[in-house]
Amino acid sequence: MAPLAWMVLSSFKSSADVTAYPPTLVFPPTLGNYAHLFGTTPFLAYARNSLIVTAGSTVLGLLLGVPAAYAVSLTRVTWPALLTLAARMAPGTLFLLPWYVMFREAGLIGSYWALVLTHAVITMPVVIWVLLPSFDAIPRSVLEAAQVDGCGVLRSLWRIALPLVGPGLVVASILAFVFSWNYFLFALVLSNADTKTLIAAAFNFVGEGSTDWGALMAAATLIALPPLLLAAAVQRWLVSGLTLGAVKG
């Protein structure tokens, strides 16, 4: 909590107070950093871009990740999940150049599609690994009974499995949202002035000779608000989803 508190307090400090040493806990608060943030940047446009990219990549990541997690749980074949985890653990710079070339050849550099697709690839492994314990916790007898009654794989996923893994689905959605919302590298390289997201726009306050720490902390505070508010709103499902499948037997 200390870094978050320091970030929020610094957003209300003047430039002199932010860089003062030793740090001051008592200072005259100012809204100048927020006024500078909204006065010099199209902050609301960047927020709209972030919402479009994050919502699109979260939905796409769920559409791809939920059936994949269900298939891995149903078949007990673990290598696809291990492969996606290995891809997720690889540094983003490993994929940056080939993805940039691919999207440039497709004419998608600077478009929402480039950001949505790359962020969906980033969030899908998270969705798979969060939902695997939830699907594994469903009794096999329930799924077998659904198959006996004529439910196919997709229908049993939609009608039987998904209602039983609601908390896990909430956790997967939140984590996918947070990962996409906060991802910096591809948002910086694949966007342009019209599609730049908040996390990439905040980098504008970092200069070669100096950094506008007050405006940067104000931007960081506002960027951190949506994930925090979302997690607080669904805290009950978040806790149960994280613990689901942790204890068996």
Model-derived regions, located:
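A hydrophobic, multi-pass inner-membrane permease signature
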Residues: 1-249
